[in-house]
Amino acid sequence: MSEAKTTAVQANNDIYTGTSSYNTFNYLTRNLINDVATAIPVKVVGVQAGTGSVGYVDVLPLVTFVSGANKAVQPVNLYHLPYYRIQGGNAAIIIDPIIGDKGLAIFAQADCSTVNADTTEPQQPGSKRTHSQSDGFYLGGFLNQSPSCFIELKQDNTIVLTANSGITINGTVTVNGDVVANGISLSTHTHGGVDTGGGSTSGPQ
């Protein structure tokens, strides 16, 4: 392609150009591609959370769209996106998102509005729409601030659990091994001040 034609292709970005059929084809192709929703970074602006089968978020895309005239178009909120939870069967780790979290919205290939928590068999699409932002899911945990409550699995085969406000366990705790609290072993600690009768021991050592 000559230098003159290259300049013309780059300078004409709309369907009305008569300089090159390539421009027209390129314009139409880009418009078709722009209608295909894949994934986009988002910010959480609303949360419907809980310990039920599913939670939802409302999100705002963090990247503006571009019009045919190369002008920025402000995005609008996307509503009622199911958010990801680490779960297998009836066991789960529940970390509900909060307003202000950043993550990734991904979009299904077809209308999946007919699929819900009770679905066990393939369903017909709810409509003929495809690759639409109406069929989004939210994956959290991208580009957020440092956490203050976390579980850290380390390469030395230890686990560090940090929860400055305390830990609540609902159930029986079984420990295969020792428990050490403030340097005192549960299995091998001793007590002083032991006398027969109704006396009490001193604290553990």
Each model region followed by its residue ranges:
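Low-complexity, small-hydrophobic/phenylalanine-enriched stretches
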Residues: L153-S185, H189-D195
